[in-house]
Amino acid sequence: MEGTDPVNKKLAAALSGGAVLVLALSGCSDDSNDKLNSWAKQVCDKVQPQAKKIESANAAIQKETSDNSAPADVQKTDSKAFQDMSDAYKAIGDAVDKAGAPNVDGGEKKQQDAVKELDKISTSYADLKKQVDKLDTDDQAKFAEGLKGIAGSLDKLSQSGSDALKNLEEGDVGKAMAKQESCKSASATPSGS
């Protein structure tokens, strides 16, 4: 399936960039603010399984990419992966929302901005799922062209929208999150590094 292979590789590369958003929910350093530590634990405990879900979805797409799979198989894998990512980002947004504002200056705005951003990312992945579901798997050229468009959208998605998350996790919030075991394991790579 030579026509779709380069596009699949672009798709996989763009997905890897998107996963960085979730895995960035870990900071570095320490702090003694009990309320903030409690908030960080609540969020990190919810983020960990979602980060694993996103990592698994990325791995599935990358595996399908390296297999030279048939268009129908690529479509099925991508569709499920996009749905999983949509669900995961929505769950992370819900976790940040339910945790309330972190106990820092401007915490409420940071929290609200992050929730909006996570919901937007979730919706974007749901839209990508709809797009991939509509692709014509019987016509390899049309399928490759459709995948190329999806890869372009995915690339834009992976490059945009991380400002609110970065803003949420900066300073004391990032320090508190860095101390949480669940955030440490959520940011670990599959190789254990």
Regions found by a protein language model. Give the residues of each.
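Long amphipathic alpha-helices with heptad-repeat character
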Residues: V47-I54, N58-I61, F82-M85, L118-I121, ...
